[in-house]
Amino acid sequence: MFSRASVVGLSACAVQPQWIQVRNMATLKDITRRLKSIKNIQKITKSMKMVAAAKYARAERELKPARVYGTGSLALYEKADIKAPEDKKKHLIIGVSSDRGLCGAIHSSVAKQMKNEVAALTAAGKEVMIVGVGEKIKGILYRTHSDQFLVSFKDVGRKPPTFGDASVIALELLNSGYEFDEGSIIFNQFKSVISYKTEEKPIFSLNTIATAETMSIYDDIDADVLQNYQEYNLANLIYYSLKESTTSEQSARMTAMDNASKNASDMIDKLTLTFNRTRQAVITKELIEIISGAAALD
């Protein structure tokens, strides 16, 4: 009764909805898998935000008394206006970061300023050596400045920094054998929960301080006293920079994890909407097939 072409055409029409249904079912499985994955990630980011918030609260409390160390140590340099002579060539740059990531551009901002400083000093004919406090700063700079690395320190940022940690770093620098004339410490200075600023503070060697012209206004300064002051001053500045950097890092991580959690919520909402639309399309197609089949039987 029917031609061969008609039968083939009918078979093709009958098979096509099945392929569409299989494709939609596969899409639903993919969406379900993605939703589950994103929800798990969101749980992690929310937990990390809570941990960072607790660490930030402690770091901010400890930062206020630590700032006294920094301002006190810089007072002599500012009052006496100590500067290294232009003919002094050896310069030391200390970059303060940590071993942990997921905190925005905290580490890259310090690395960027260090690169700019190294380039400027090298162009001026200075001999520049780098000290990295934290694995992150070493990971960023070591590939391009490996020949300028004097020493690096790890296990930074896992626990709140103490003055003992700063003293160990200062002692290691003084015993490194590199007799620098002047230098700088580059770190992130905490401003508020949502902002920080990359700062640079000066440091000077014992010889530079002792031979500075402005030091003549101070009478009867014993050499041992001046040496003790210079060593203590270096530890103070490192401690201050560690505290500022830690507070900035925890606040940045808290903000980054909060943004990640919000982005995950947006993705979950969009995927849920897509899932519902796809499921509704599958149900509609199945109903059409049932109705069409029932109508054909009638």
Swiss-Prot record:
Presence of the UniProt keyword Transit peptide in the record: yes
Compartment(s): Mitochondrion inner membrane
GO biological process: proton motive force-driven mitochondrial ATP synthesis
Protein's UniProt keywords contain Protein biosynthesis: no
UniProt transit peptide range: 1-25
Family: Belongs to the ATPase gamma chain family.
Described function: Subunit gamma, of the mitochondrial membrane ATP synthase complex (F(1)F(0) ATP synthase or Complex V) that produces ATP from ADP in the presence of a proton gradient across the membrane which is generated by electron transport complexes of the respiratory chain. ATP synthase complex consist of a soluble F(1) head domain - the catalytic core - and a membrane F(1) domain - the membrane proton channel. These two domains are linked by a central stalk rotating inside the F(1) region and a stationary peripheral stalk.
UniProt name for this protein: ATP synthase F(1) complex subunit gamma, mitochondrial
Gene name per UniProt: Atp5f1c
